[in-house]
Structure formats: structure tokens, C-alpha cells
Amino acid sequence: GFVALLKKLPLILKHLH
């Protein structure tokens, strides 16, 4: 769901940095 995506966002941001 959308909430799960929001929880994954921080992890994605870490991978981008």
C-alpha cells in the first residue's frame, strides 16, 4: 500500500546517497 511505500522511501534515499 501507500504507507508501505512511505516507509521504503528513507531506504531508497539512503541508496541514492
Curated annotation (Swiss-Prot):
Expressed by the venom gland. It is found in: Secreted; Target cell membrane. Keywords: Amidation, Antibiotic, Antimicrobial, Fungicide, Membrane, Secreted, Target cell membrane, Target membrane. The modification Histidine amide is found at residue 17. This is Antimicrobial peptide Xac-1. One of its GO terms (cellular component) is extracellular region. Belongs to the xylopin-like family. It comes from the Eukaryota. GO terms for biological process: defense response to fungus; defense response to Gram-negative bacterium; defense response to Gram-positive bacterium; killing of cells of another organism. Its main location: secreted. Antimicrobial and mast cell degranulating peptide which probably acts by forming pores in membranes. Active against both Gram-negative and Gram-positive bacterial strains as well as against yeasts. Has leishmanicidal activity (IC(50)=25uM). Has little hemolytic activity. In the context of inflammation and cancer tests, is weakly cytotoxic to normal cells, induces calcium signaling but does not impact cAMP production. In addition, prevents LPS-induced nitric oxid (NO) synthesis but does not affect the IP3 signaling and pro-inflammatory activation of endothelial cells.
